[in-house]
Amino acid sequence: MRILETERLILRHLVPDDLDHLFALYSDAETRQYFPEGTLTYEETKEELEWFLNGHPEHPELGLWATMYKETNRFIGRCGLLPWTIDGRTEVEVAYLLDKSYWRQGLGTEAAQAIAQYGFEQLHLSRLICLIYRRNQASVKVAQNIGMTFEKEGVDEVGPFLLFSMHKQPSSI
């Protein structure tokens, strides 16, 4: 089921047939270089996909979605909205991970912008964040490009991160 569409991308629900594509993404060391847990095995990828297929028990409207390159209908990544608890508060992250052959084309920004708009307009969220490993300057740039600003450094169960955030802008009506 299609969730979002941009000029060059389609974001849709993940399906079991996405497993091999997701594994190709998750098993690539360069693509996963900023994830503290590193690459994932096929079984770990399968478990993560099953978790996303089942939906978050408290936030079923959130999750990661297959990211398809519209021109070729090729699976090029996974993006979406993820719930986190930070400092005792529930936050929603704009998350994005694209196949490295699609980097440096503005696709991360295009996906993140559409996801943020969806979060604000369709889900009526008032705040969105990005959690970024401090050396991941490409993700920092994506967050800044969609209007997020640096808020703080932090550490969670996965490791150290930079927290960027943005708030829903009041309607001009």
What are these regions (language model features)?
Residues T41-P60:
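Active-site rim helix/loop that mediates acceptor-substrate recognition in acyltransferases
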Residues R32-L40:
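A short gly/proline-enriched turn/hairpin at secondary-structure junctions
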